[in-house]
Amino acid sequence: MSSVAKVPLYERPSDYVFDMTTLNSADAKRLWRAAIKEAWNNRCAYCGATPITNNSLTIDHVRAKSRGGQDCTSNVIPACRRCNQEKASLEWVAWFRLQPFYSIVAEWRIREWLRTGEVPAFDSDEETAVWFNSILSEAV
């Protein structure tokens, strides 16, 4: 039985070359993007959609590259092609809060990812509520 090794998630694509996971930058970027998508269970961070093909799940720069955003894990999230194109170079929170699929829980998941590089995982609505209440109590 063959098993597929989980790709580690590094802060930057170049870290895959430095760690000798790969020897070229194109493979490094591909591995980095795959690890980000895998961390989010191959779902759009904004609308939660699971795209039909891997190509339709893109990587969105939360702070657009045109506004100085970098290629680093703390600035990118997986987004379906539709969300990525609609957001374009807009400020993510302002854009996201105007969407019909907006969710405060999704916003806080994105914020946690940008802060820590980890996606809070929940098995139930109760677990989500407990986590969200802990975030709110920390903010107060």
Where are these regions (language model features)?
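Generic detector of intrinsically disordered, low-complexity, polar/charged segments
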Residues: 45, 65-66, 103, 114
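Polar low-complexity intrinsically disordered regions
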Residues: 1-2, 79
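Short, charged/polar micro-motifs that form catalytic or ligand-binding hotspots
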Residues: 34-37, 66, 70, 82
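Histidine-centered nuclease catalytic patch
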Residues: 48-78, 87-99
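Short, charged surface segments at domain edges that flank catalytic/cofactor-binding sites
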Residues: 2-46, 111-123, 128-136
